[in-house]
Structures are given as C-alpha cells and as structure tokens.
Regions:
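Exported/periplasmic ABC-transporter solute-binding proteins
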Residues: 1-208
C-alpha cells in the first residue's frame, strides 16, 4: 500500500466478526440472510416493519441502532451488507457501543450491529443471530466461515521505518508474537498460528 509515495504494509493482528444483535425477548428472528439484512437496513422510503421480511413476523416497527459513521464497523457493514444502498434514515447512531447495547436491551423490536467483542461482553443481555445460517463464534470467525461479516484487524506500518529503525522492527516483531493473546483478552479472535508465522516472514522480507 502506498500513500504520498510512502509505502505501508498491513499486518493482520486479529479477527473480528460484525455481530447482528436483537433483544433477548425477540422470539421470531434466529437467522437472516445477507439479502434480508440489506432489505431491512436499506432506506427505501417506507416504515420498516419485521413483517416486510417474513409475513409471519410481527407488523411492529423495527428500531435500528448502529455505530457512528466514522467507525470502521459502520464502514464495513456499509460495504459488505448495504453496498450501494443508503442506511435507513431512522437509525440511532452512537460512537458508544454501550449506548447501542442499551437501546437493544430496552426495546423488543430493536436490532443493531456491533463488533464481536461488544456482543461477548453483553451476551447475557442481548441475542445474537445467525447470518446465512452461521452463528458468530471464535471458530467460525477465525475460519472465515462466518462470512461476509468476518474481517481482519490490521496494523499499517511504514516500510522505511521497519528497515531503518531497529526499535520499530523490534516492536512489530513483538506485536506479531503477542498480539493474538492480547486481542483475545479484549474479546477479539486471534489468527491461526500459521498466519502469525506468515506475518513474521513478511517482516523479515521487508527488513532486508
């Protein structure tokens, strides 16, 4: 990756899985396809009701909660789910994930998307649903089976700094060796061991 003639290398440090959550008293939603999520979350000028997805679901209006537009979580959801559609106008956006969770907890007809770590921290208070028949777990996120909502978390490092500054190269090596366990401590999913070994080989190539 180049920016203003400066070359950066993205190092994968962990995985995340965007998790679709609903109120724990929601008894009708257990699984949604990507197409259904797109239909529900896309602005089309109508009041959004659950029954628009399945006729057997309630005719109640859906309440939407999501991260702010400056967050990577919002960007990823826009790219892989909404694509070229605009998000619903009646969505409550917040940079505070706890505010989002509180909204879902307090409304039986609420839905939101959050990072896997925030779902895990509140898994006894909200209900996660399957996407395309796959439930978000460490295993399905790590393997990529939970798609398209599994995503890598990246650290971008200046190649010249790696080559010319020993402390930067040492720091990146330390990061690769330890970041998996540190990431899991805060709720993210570490990569497979061979993936970290691949990152170390990439670092060695850059240092030459």
């Amino acid at each position: 990756m180049k920016k203003n003639s400066i070359q950066f290398t993205p190092f994968e440090v962990a995985n995340d899985g965007l998790t679709i959550v609903v109120n724990r008293h929601n008894t009708w939603v257990d699984d949604m396809s990507v197409d259904e999520l797109r239909l529900l979350w896309s602005e089309d000028g109508r009041e959004k009701r659950w029954s628009q997805i399945h006729s057997t679901w309630p005719r109640e209006q859906v309440k939407f909660y999501a991260p702010g537009v400056d967050s990577g979580t919002y960007d990823y959801f826009q790219n892989v789910i909404l694509q070229n559609h605009r998000i619903v106008k009646k969505v409550s956006l917040s940079e505070d994930d706890q505010v989002i969770m509180q909204g879902v907890m307090n409304d039986k007809h609420a839905i939101a998307f959050v990072g896997y770590a925030y779902y895990m921290a509140n898994r006894d208070k909200v209900k996660a649903i399957k996407v395309n028949g796959v439930f978000p777990t460490k295993e399905t996120i790590q393997s990529g089976k939970y798609k398209p909502l599994s995503r890598p978390l990246l650290a971008y490092v200046n190649n010249a700094s790696i080559r010319n500054k020993m402390n930067v190269a040492n720091y990146v090596e330390f990061m690769i060796q330890h970041v998996g366990n540190l990431a899991e401590e805060v709720g993210y999913v570490k990569l497979r061991k061979e993936k970290y070994n691949e990152q170390l080989r990439m670092l060695t190539e850059i240092k030459r």
